[in-house]
A protein has these predicted regions:
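A short acidic, often aromatic-flanked loop/helix-cap motif at beta-alpha or helix-coil junctions
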Residues: 10-12, 67-73, 111-114
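Short, glycine/charged-enriched secondary-structure capping and boundary segments
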Residues: 45-48, 76-78, 109-111
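Local sequence-structure signature of Cys/Sec-based thiol-disulfide redox active-site neighborhoods
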Residues: 16-57
């Protein structure tokens, strides 16, 4: 499953300091926080369907926060949350969860590295 994060999910992460357990439950999940213009994100986005096929039970979420038209959340506020809470100013930024627990993070990574960090 690959899908975009909602404004409510992003606001909840800002409130709680991480993404809700319901999003990351299951064997593996990845949350990608990025901006639409990033060439490395374009590369990653192109291989996500292959990752989804290989990782049948994985949950893959993303948000391109620079182009979101959120009602109650400013794009810059979400970027500041990502940079300050997760101490990462680079994009794309990826958080990996195994069995519902945060396991590690990365920035751009190859398809094989992405699959490996999700347990394959």
């Amino acid at each position: 499953m690959i899908r975009k994060l909602t404004e409510a999910e992003c606001r909840a992460a800002m409130k709680n300091g991480d993404f809700e357990a319901a999003l990351v439950q299951g064997p593996s999940a990845a949350i990608i926080l990025t901006q639409s213009w990033c060439p490395q994100w374009t590369s990653m986005k192109s291989y996500l369907p292959k990752a989804e096929e290989a990782l049948k039970d994985a949950r893959i979420y993303y948000v391109e926060y620079d182009i979101e038209n959120w009602e109650k959340l400013e794009n810059e506020a979400f970027m500041a949350f990502k940079e300050n809470t997760f101490n990462n100013r680079e994009i794309p930024y990826v958080r990996y969860y195994l069995n519902g627990v945060f396991s590690r993070d990365s920035n751009y990574i190859s398809l094989e590295g992405f699959k490996s960090r999700l347990g394959l």
